């Protein structure tokens, strides 16, 4: 059997070498030897999101944050800060038809892996774990205590009064209402009490509506998340309905209250022209 010419074998071997992947060799050739002394200096005040390595894995560089460009090649995907990943941006991909034909590489941005709110040890809710970590690094740079994640989701907080009830003046037979808006996490439970004081000044409360036929209580969630709005409707108004009414909110983290007075008169001319601030008819 006749052997193939030596020139033909050499040509085939050369062709195989040309077909081999060149990514790893070309990458190492582009990077060259690592010389830490020649690495550019980092910012004087340090990196806000910590450090990572450059595309060659040699020089320290500042890690990139959410929404900042990253990537450009497989070796460059380590530029994002810990807890983030380099994801192609659909918005930036539009109009890049030339990229498939040897044009510029598709750009990408750093995106947080945990895209849900978290509660920090400082009692503040952060939109993501990445933003909590960034806040912790800023706190440490100021010499403050690091912030850690306490739980997933928003931080629990005691109730607070968003809109308190207002004092009311009106005549007997009228229809009046008090309203109160509260917020808290978990969502508070809102109740109404009528405050009574005896001759010695001792206060006691009567849970409403009780057995009053002319009084109704209504409560609904909102207008914002974890908010509750409640109303007391009195119709028809009588002298017995005069007094102090308390809006009381409570949850597992605490309680809050606000009060307003209903003053009942026989005729409109008995209502003083200058009432306390926030009073209404």
UniProtKB/Swiss-Prot annotation:
Per UniProt, the keywords (alphabetical) are: Cell adhesion, Disulfide bond, Glycoprotein, Growth factor binding, Immunoglobulin domain, Phosphoprotein, Secreted, Signal
Q: List the disulfide bonds.
A: 31-56, 34-58, 39-59, 47-62, 70-86, 80-110, 112-130, 119-155, 180-247
Where in or outside the cell is it found? Answer: Secreted
Concerning Gene3D superfamilies, the annotation shows: 3.30.60.30, 4.10.40.20, Immunoglobulins
Q: Origin, by domain of life?
A: Eukaryota
Residues of the Ig-like C2-type domain: 159-263
Per its record, what are the GO molecular function terms?
insulin-like growth factor binding
Q: Extract the signal peptide range.
A: 1-25
User: Entry's InterPro entries?
Assistant: Growth_fac_rcpt_cys_sf, Ig-like_dom, Ig-like_dom_sf, Ig-like_fold, Ig_I-set, Ig_sub, Ig_sub2, IGFBP-like
Instruction: Tell me, using the record's free text, what induces this protein.
Output: By retinoic acid.
Glycosylated residues, chain numbering: 170
Reported effect of changing residue 94 to R? In RNA edited version
The segment(s) forming the Kazal-like domain are 98-157
Q: What modifications does the entry list under PTM / processing?
A: N-glycosylated.
This entry carries the following GO cellular component terms, namely:
collagen-containing extracellular matrix; extracellular space
KW Glycoprotein (keyword) present: yes
Q: How does it assemble?
A: May interact with VPS24/CHMP3; the relevance of such interaction however remains unclear. Interacts with CD93; this interaction plays a role in endothelial cells angiogenesis.
Summarizing the function annotation, the protein's role is: Binds IGF1 and IGF2 with a relatively low affinity. Stimulates prostacyclin (PGI2) production. Stimulates cell adhesion. Acts as a ligand for CD93 to play a role in angiogenesis.
Q: What is this protein called?
A: Insulin-like growth factor-binding protein 7
Source organism of this protein record: Mus musculus
Record lineage: Eukaryota, Metazoa, Chordata, Craniata, Vertebrata
